[in-house]
Amino acid sequence: MASKGGRDKIKLESTAGTGHFYTTTKNKRTKPEKMEIMKFDPVARKHVAYKETKIK
């Protein structure tokens, strides 16, 4: 039987306050810190920082 995968599902939420988010996976062993990445927010219609939050 295979072991559990090392990747967690995470939600990247916009810091612009629009409520828009992306979902992705992250390797929890190699990158234990919170992810922050610049991505396009279609509601704000510009590139903004997206911060990692847990999927509820």
UniProtKB/Swiss-Prot annotation:
Q: List compositional bias (Basic and acidic residues) regions by residue number.
A: 1-12
What is the name listed in the Swiss-Prot or TrEMBL entry for this protein? Large ribosomal subunit protein bL33
An annotated GO cellular component: cytosolic large ribosomal subunit
Which Gene3D superfamilies does its entry note?
Answer: Ribosomal protein L33
Bias (Polar residues) ranges = 15-25
This protein's UniProt keywords: Ribonucleoprotein, Ribosomal protein
GO molecular function term, any single one = structural constituent of ribosome
Among InterPro entries, the record links this protein to: Ribosomal_bL33, Ribosomal_bL33_CS, Ribosomal_bL33_sf, Ribosomal_zn-bd
Q: Does the keyword Ribosomal protein apply?
A: yes
- Protein family according to the UniProt entry: Belongs to the bacterial ribosomal protein bL33 family.
Q: What's the source species for this entry? A: Ralstonia nicotianae (strain ATCC BAA-1114 / GMI1000) (Ralstonia solanacearum)
State the superkingdom: Bacteria
GO biological process: what's one of them? translation
For region Disordered, the annotated ranges are 1-30
Q: What is the lineage of its organism?
A: Bacteria, Pseudomonadati, Pseudomonadota, Betaproteobacteria, Burkholderiales
NCBIfam families associated with the record: PRK00595.1, rpmG_bact
